[in-house]
């Protein structure tokens, strides 16, 4: 596909690495960023360790237009994501009045005051601006550095999604490439992925703006089930949809020739 602005997702949390928590945030963000027109180039998971966070953020700076971290924004000792971001930027942490007001307001509504641990959530990398958390206590942060927009979001999925949609998405739309992205697909029954492969390859050659991927769900032999997803980019929604449908038609022809059937369809 044509080159688009790159995005990196850096997930922070020991609980992700030891398998205690499934990283649904990365999948959710990957989908949203792709539909905005960014090319998600890398998803990395690191422990709650300042040096590891700084290393990955530092690698992303200048290489990815958008760098999003998730997790590690809370009040506890192991919430160190913003320290890692600050280290990568070569900056210190600074108490941000706007972020502090967000934290104060959250706890005030619950009849609670500020403590040292709660104030910690308002310490942002120097030069960063807070992202309001519509659901929880910890603000996010966003900063431009070395050609990259670095945004830090909470790890709790409901908080992360709300902050992305309300606070970060408008910023991303300003730097997203022009055009439209369409994603759709079909579920193919009775055809092994290996038999379908030549048709998928043919579909992917419809246009450099089209990406076709097969996902086998059943066994290769016996009762094969293959989901085929098509992602198309174009200058308008209509053009993107037309490209996607053209690619899907190649796959449909293959299904028919191979004696299979389509059990589900996700329209473009």
Swiss-Prot record:
Q: Which InterPro entries match?
A: CinA (IPR050101), CinA_Arc (IPR023055), MoaB/Mog-like_dom_sf (IPR036425), MoaB/Mog_dom (IPR001453)
Instruction: Supply the Gene3D superfamilies for this chain.
Output: MoaB/Mog-like domain (3.40.980.10)
A family per Pfam: MoCF_biosynth
Q: Which SUPFAM superfamilies match?
A: Molybdenum cofactor biosynthesis proteins
- Which family does the similarity line name? Belongs to the CinA family.
Name of this chain's protein? Protein APE_1980.1
Q: Where does this protein come from, organism-wise?
A: Aeropyrum pernix (strain ATCC 700893 / DSM 11879 / JCM 9820 / NBRC 100138 / K1)
């Amino acid at each position: 596909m044509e080159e688009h602005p790159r995005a990196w997702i850096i997930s922070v949390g020991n609980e992700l690495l030891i398998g205690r928590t499934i990283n649904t945030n990365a999948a959710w963000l990957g989908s949203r960023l792709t539909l905005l027109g960014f090319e998600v180039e890398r998803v990395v998971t690191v422990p709650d360790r300042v040096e590891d966070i700084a290393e990955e953020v530092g690698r992303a700076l200048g290489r990815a237009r958008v760098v999003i971290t998730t997790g590690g924004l809370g009040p506890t000792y192991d919430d160190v994501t913003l320290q890692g971001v600050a280290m990568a930027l070569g900056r210190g942490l600074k108490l941000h009045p706007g972020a502090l007001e967000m934290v104060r307001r959250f706890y005030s509504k619950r009849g609670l005051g500020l403590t040292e641990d709660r104030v910690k959530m308002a310490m942002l990398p120097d030069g960063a601006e807070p992202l309001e958390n519509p659901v929880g206590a910890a603000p996010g942060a966003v900063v431009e550095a070395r050609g990259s927009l670095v945004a830090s979001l909470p790890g709790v999925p409901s908080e992360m999604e709300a902050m992305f949609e309300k606070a970060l998405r408008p910023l991303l739309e300003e730097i997203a490439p022009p055009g439209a992205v369409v994603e759709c697909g079909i579920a193919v029954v009775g055809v092994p992925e290996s038999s379908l492969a030549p048709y998928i390859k043919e579909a992917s050659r419809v246009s450099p703006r089209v990406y076709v991927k097969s996902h086998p769900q059943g066994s290769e032999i016996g009762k094969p089930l293959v989901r085929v997803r098509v992602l198309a980019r174009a200058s308008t929604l209509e053009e993107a949809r037309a490209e996607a449908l053209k690619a899907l038609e190649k796959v449909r022809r293959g299904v028919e020739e191979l004696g299979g059937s389509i059990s589900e369809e996700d329209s473009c």
